[in-house]
Amino acid sequence: MDVIKTQQISARTIEKVVVHPLVLLSIVDHYNRVAKDSSKRVVGVLLGSSSRGVVDVTNSYAVPFEEDDKDPSIWFLDHNYHESMFHMFKRINAKEHVVGWYSTGPKLRENDLDVHALFNGYVPNPVLVIIDVQPKELGIPTKAYYAVEEVKENATQKSQKVFVHVSTEIAAHEVEEIGVEHLLRDVKDTTISTLATEVTAKLTALKGLDARLREIRSYLDLVIEGKLPLNHEILYHLQDVFNLLPNLNVNELVKAFSVKTNDMMLVIYLSSLIRSVIALHNLINNKLLNKEHEKAEDSKPVAIPATS
């Protein structure tokens, strides 16, 4: 049965969530203090502002949270602690408001909608940001969601809330950029060449593409097996992606790829050859310099101690 989203929690749709580095550092510190080396997750409150569909997350704080691993419906979040912390943060910066909550997931869980409903009492349309504190691949370790109402086509069943994914990005003010650069100063390796950086970036992009393709394949397999309902909207998006793929059977395109690959291999070969010649040249110079030092040491007069 087809499902159509007909009503959202707020009149304005969230288009993007911007997370600041201070928030990421605070969440990682929270995880390391509470749930490191365990399967538990940590939960906290996100502070910031929202304007024209963009949620700007500038600060956060942790809240006590417990849940039953066997029964997801059993969980506890300390309301009093949250309200006390928010009042203290409000004194420091009155412009920051509750915009949602965070979790170290690393994926959505069954009781997330219940926790999300709790934050509806503090903000009309809260966002959920899941932070992967132990990412397996490079990239942005954040995923953001907001809730919408969903009803069946025949309207015989009650509407239910579901999460909708929204794009995220990492951004910082000038002061934050200076602090982040200071923290990463000892991490950066200045000896890495630009070519190596570009190759690493392309490799990361290919790994990300491979992961997305695997997710698509897994989703389609679940739909075929009947474990997930058929969603025409997702299939339309997939069809649009496949329609954008180029026809790789064209002779001109195959020839162009071959020429491009041969040119790149030639550049790599010449680079390796030049690097070897330079290394050999430096080795010869080092040998000659050592011989000159040895000759200079041998030509020095040896001091003979005077006899009494």
UniProtKB/Swiss-Prot annotation:
Signal peptide positions (record): none
PROSITE patterns reported for this sequence: MPN
Tissue spec. comment: Ubiquitous with highest expression in flowers.
GO biological process annotation, one example: leaf morphogenesis
Species name: Arabidopsis thaliana (Mouse-ear cress)
GO MF annotation list: metallopeptidase activity
Family statement drawn from the similarity comment of this UniProt entry: Belongs to the peptidase M67A family.
Function: Acts as a regulatory subunit of the 26S proteasome which is involved in the ATP-dependent degradation of ubiquitinated proteins. Required for innate immunity.
Organism lineage string: Eukaryota, Viridiplantae, Streptophyta, Embryophyta, Tracheophyta
GO cellular component, one term: plasma membrane
Positions of post-translational N-acetylmethionine modification: M1
Protein name stated in the entry: 26S proteasome non-ATPase regulatory subunit 7 homolog A
Pfam families the UniProt entry points to: JAB (PF01398), MitMem_reg (PF13012)
